[in-house]
């Protein structure tokens, strides 16, 4: 079966936004206009096609990114057919991991902003992730029909809060209930969508007189941005020659792909205006797989290489999501970077070192599925029958092995004990938790060795709440959940130049002998643990050095203050001794562990607690209450902003330990009129009284 769409007509994009910016509605409209959905699904009715887990429909928020393939020929039907693969990403901060995964496999993104709320905290997080993976993007300002809608305010916020370089390619005609359509600055025409046809028909008309001056001013800024793409265009522009529509689009495309500008559009997805033009911009301004750099990878021997987006190259793909489908079992979503793969082919997973046979291949459309026979470079599809692959792993041709760069996932900041309600739930719970942890690398499951309890950890209260809920719905496991626990850490503040660990056992027969001397030093926050081998003259034989490191690493799991994991310490092994007969790996492992524990005690150990960046949007009357409450929660105020049309945004850094149950507290402080978002910022040293209380609680 030959390729249906040439690769230069592919667009792999994400639609990304803050909660409630109307992203799922926007995606729904995209599916409607591209002819896939004949009845528009409304999030308000809990019927949206992309939000396909029961919980998402109940909560009205998107949790898992569904991948959908659609086709578009332009809103006027005059473009060659393009294949748009859309990954719908969640906007809630507890699901940042989902956004991060999808950014990794996208070529471009549409950032959806609310015309009233503007650039909100989560928008900044998503923006940083898109910067990290250098994803070219467009901005779509949605909800132009809402009271308080202000397109130009969002433009200013993008410049100040995101440090972006937005370029308007449209301006709105009216706002709030008077929002009628847009002025297309490239064509310098007004565009009106027909409401009776749900926006499938539209007309170009002259620009309203009252907008002419504003349209000319913004058009000039856009032309200047386009002209900066090359010297010849700049000369033409400065010489007073007009630029053709073709030249403008080509120049804007070039600068968008280079991440130098962010073209900005507007509309209201709910009222069927503007999404059609956004789709045109996706095709005209965002990159195809050929426009982005070839994917970097490593060969088997570790040499860096690249794989080009071509069917003629050997097959390579990246698994970016695992989902359990009620009908076909486990689905692995992957992005093909190079080559072709057919169902039934054998592929290799270099991270696991295993070959696997691909069962069925599915093209997903939200939660509908179509079986396909093969996938080509640039495709996003799902495979059934891969048992070993997990998120972030490479799938490649067994005869040409490469590893695409691995994804790095954040450490969880919150834990809860979870217990099955009945004996029958016990086994099912283990299975369910492992399945969920496989799907979501930011969710961890472990058994507490002392209490025997099962501990689940994640990125926030909502994250864990939803996972426990899924356990009940999808796996039928009833579980009781303990109080949330903070994931504290321990580290040291001083250097301990010399600390000795000696493990000697003499009890008849062969003894045990291991002796090491370490130096411990604090590392910069976030640097993690580092082991340095500085042994000279073989005082500790080569073969025992890994055992010393292993002993230290095992000790890292449980610090000396309250048994929390130890971070940001450098341990240098520089001296020791051994015995010809009695020394063995175990003895050196024990010696390493003893030395490290002793060194920790001498190096001014401290307790670290996770600090959260909290933003509260509140009416002005309650601002004093909110700020006073932050102080009582050991919060440090970071600043305030005005919300146009009244209200304030208060920003603070607050220890996670003080934030449990905050949503209830905030509701009663502000009569339910404030909203907040919270995300993990960094670890900071806990004050002495807090550390003592945590240690006392652990000692009980």
UniProtKB/Swiss-Prot annotation:
One cellular component term from this protein's GO annotations in UniProt: cytoplasm
Positions contributing to GTP binding: 17-24, 88-92, 142-145
GO biological process assignments: ribosome disassembly
Major localization class: cytoplasm
Assigned keywords, A-Z: Cytoplasm, Elongation factor, GTP-binding, Nucleotide-binding, Protein biosynthesis
MF terms (GO), sorted A to Z: GTP binding; GTPase activity; guanosine tetraphosphate binding; translation elongation factor activity
Localization per Swiss-Prot or TrEMBL: Cytoplasm
Taxonomy, superkingdom: Bacteria
PROSITE patterns the UniProt entry points to: G_TR_1, G_TR_2
tr-type G domain boundaries: 8-290
Functional description taken from the UniProt entry: Catalyzes the GTP-dependent ribosomal translocation step during translation elongation. During this step, the ribosome changes from the pre-translocational (PRE) to the post-translocational (POST) state as the newly formed A-site-bound peptidyl-tRNA and P-site-bound deacylated tRNA move to the P and E sites, respectively. Catalyzes the coordinated movement of the two tRNA molecules, the mRNA and conformational changes in the ribosome.
Family statement drawn from the similarity comment of this UniProt entry: Belongs to the TRAFAC class translation factor GTPase superfamily. Classic translation factor GTPase family. EF-G/EF-2 subfamily.
Protein name as it appears in the record: Elongation factor G
Lineage: Bacteria, Pseudomonadati, Pseudomonadota, Betaproteobacteria, Burkholderiales
């Amino acid at each position: 079966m030959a390729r249906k769409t040439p690769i230069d007509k592919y667009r792999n994009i994400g639609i990304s936004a803050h909660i409630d910016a109307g992203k799922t509605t926007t995606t729904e409209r995209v599916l409607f206009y591209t002819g896939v959905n004949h009845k528009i699904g409304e999030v308000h009715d809990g019927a949206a096609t992309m939000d396909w887990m029961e919980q998402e429909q109940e909560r009205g928020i998107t949790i898992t990114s569904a991948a959908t393939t659609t086709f578009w020929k332009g809103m006027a039907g005059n473009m060659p057919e393009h294949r748009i693969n859309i990954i719908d990403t969640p906007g809630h901060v507890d699901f940042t991991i989902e956004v991060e995964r999808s950014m990794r496999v996208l070529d471009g993104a549409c950032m959806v902003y609310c015309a009233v709320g503007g650039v909100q905290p989560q928008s900044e997080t998503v923006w940083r992730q898109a910067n990290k993976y250098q994803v070219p993007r467009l901005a779509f300002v949605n909800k132009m029909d809402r009271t308080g809608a202000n397109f130009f305010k969002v433009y200013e916020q993008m410049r100040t809060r995101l440090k972006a370089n937005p370029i308007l390619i449209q301006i709105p005609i009216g706002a709030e209930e008077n929002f009628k359509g847009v002025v297309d600055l490239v064509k310098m025409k007004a565009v009106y969508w027909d409401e009776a046809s749900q926006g499938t028909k539209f007309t170009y008309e002259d620009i309203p007189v009252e907008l002419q001056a504003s349209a000319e001013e913004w058009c000039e800024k856009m032309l200047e941005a386009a002209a900066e793409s090359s010297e010849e265009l700049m000369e033409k522009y400065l010489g007073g020659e007009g630029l053709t529509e073709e030249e403008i689009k080509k120049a804007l495309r070039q600068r968008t792909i280079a991440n130098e500008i962010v073209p900005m559009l507007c509309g209201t997805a709910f009222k069927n205006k503007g999404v059609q033009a956004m789709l045109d911009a996706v095709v005209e301004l965002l990159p195809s797989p050929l426009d982005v750099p070839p994917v970097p990878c490593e060969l088997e021997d570790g040499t860096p290489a690249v794989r080009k987006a071509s069917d003629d190259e050997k097959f390579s793909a990246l698994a970016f999501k695992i989902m359990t489908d009620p009908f076909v079992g486990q689905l692995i979503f992957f992005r093909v970077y190079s080559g072709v793969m057919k169902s039934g082919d054998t592929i290799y997973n270099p991270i696991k070192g295993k070959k696997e046979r691909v069962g069925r291949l599915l093209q997903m459309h939200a939660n509908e599925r179509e079986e396909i026979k093969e996938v080509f470079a640039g495709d996003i599809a799902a495979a059934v029958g891969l048992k070993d692959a997990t998120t972030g792993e490479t799938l490649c041709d067994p005869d040409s092995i490469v590893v695409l760069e691995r994804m790095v996932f954040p450490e969880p900041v919150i834990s809860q004990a979870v217990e099955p309600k009945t004996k029958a739930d016990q086994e099912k719970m283990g299975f369910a938790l492992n399945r969920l942890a496989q799907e979501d690398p930011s969710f961890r499951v472990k058994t507490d060795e002392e209490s025997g309890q099962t501990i689940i950890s994640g990125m926030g209260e909502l994250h864990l709440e939803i996972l426990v809920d899924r356990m009940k719905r999808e796996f039928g496991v009833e579980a009781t959940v303990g109080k949330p626990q903070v994931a504290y850490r321990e580290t040291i503040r001083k250097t301990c130049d010399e600390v000795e660990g000696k493990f000697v056992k003499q009890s008849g027969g062969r003894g045990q002998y291991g002796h090491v001397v370490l130096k411990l030093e604090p590392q910069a926050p976030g640097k993690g643990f580092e082991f340095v081998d500085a042994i000279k003259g073989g005082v500790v034989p080569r073969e025992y050095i890994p055992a010393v490191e292993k002993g230290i690493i095992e000790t890292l799991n449980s610090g000396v203050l309250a048994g929390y994991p130890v971070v940001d310490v450098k341990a240098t092994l520089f001296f020791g001794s051994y015995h010809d007969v009695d020394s063995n790996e175990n003895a050196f492992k024990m010696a390493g562990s003893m030395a490290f524990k002793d060194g920790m005690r001498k190096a001014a150990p401290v307790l670290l607690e996770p600090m959260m960046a909290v933003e509260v949007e509140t009416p002005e009357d309650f601002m004093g209450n909110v700020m006073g409450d932050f102080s009582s929660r050991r919060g440090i105020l970071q600043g305030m902003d005005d919300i146009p049309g009244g209200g304030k945004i208060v920003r603070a850094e607050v220890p996670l330990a003080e934030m449990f149950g905050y949503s209830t507290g905030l509701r009663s402080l502000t009569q339910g009129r404030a909203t907040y978002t919270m995300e993990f910022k960094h670890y900071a040293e806990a004050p002495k009284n807090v550390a003592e209380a945590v240690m006392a609680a652990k000692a009980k």
